[in-house]
């Protein structure tokens, strides 16, 4: 469902629209998906600077806010931990052109303190830019704390 809503899968009946417009098929998509497993979607042949440049290059302050060390920009994805990759994945999705974020378990690879820091930063950016956000999570206390509305899906594979 997240891939459909973010425009990555388009073999279904109907349209996904944002602000009355269909999602673009080729250029930058204003709906960005933050994957649960960033190691599966990052090009292993690109250094992390290239991974960010594909979307945008945040300034040094934002890199620091997300706990990304500048030295990591010269590394390949396989040289970073899951938590470090997740920080890049989240930051990459926060392109200034992004209007809506779909966050699929975006903090599960992070320790508790970093989870709070990243979520606080993301929520602040989402509010300041007047963006929308869909959070997919099994962490119900987290969902209850940060979500305005909650929809529960049970056994969606059994449908």
Each language-model region and where it sits:
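Helix-to-loop junction immediately C-terminal to a conserved catalytic motif
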Residues: 6
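Conserved ABC transporter NBD signature motif
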Residues: 11-27
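Q-loop/switch helix immediately C-terminal to the Walker
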Residues: 37, 44-59
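Conserved ABC ATPase signature
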Residues: 76-80, 84
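Hydrophobic anchor residue at the start of the ABC signature
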Residues: 90, 102, 118
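Helical segment within the ABC ATPase nucleotide-binding domain
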Residues: 116-129
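H-loop/switch region of ABC-family ATPase nucleotide-binding domains
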Residues: 137-138
């Amino acid at each position: 469902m997240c891939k459909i809503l973010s425009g990555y899968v388009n073999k279904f009946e109907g349209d996904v629209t944002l602000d009355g417009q269909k999602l673009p098929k080729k250029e930058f998509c204003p709906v960005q998906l933050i994957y649960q497993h960033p190691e599966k979607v990052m090009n292993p042949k690109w250094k992390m600077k290239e991974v960010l440049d594909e979307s945008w290059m945040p300034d040094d302050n934002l890199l620091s806010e997300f706990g990304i060390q500048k030295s990591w920009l010269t590394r390949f994805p396989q040289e970073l931990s899951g938590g470090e990759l997740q920080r890049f994945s989240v930051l990459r999705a926060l392109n200034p052109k992004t209007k809506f974020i779909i966050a699929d378990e975006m903090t599960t690879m992070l320790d508790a303190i970093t989870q709070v820091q990243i979520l606080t930063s993301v929520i602040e950016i989402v509010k300041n830019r007047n963006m929308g956000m869909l959070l997919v999570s099994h962490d119900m206390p987290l969902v209850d704390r940060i979500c305005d509305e909650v929809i529960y899906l049970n056994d969606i594979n059994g449908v």
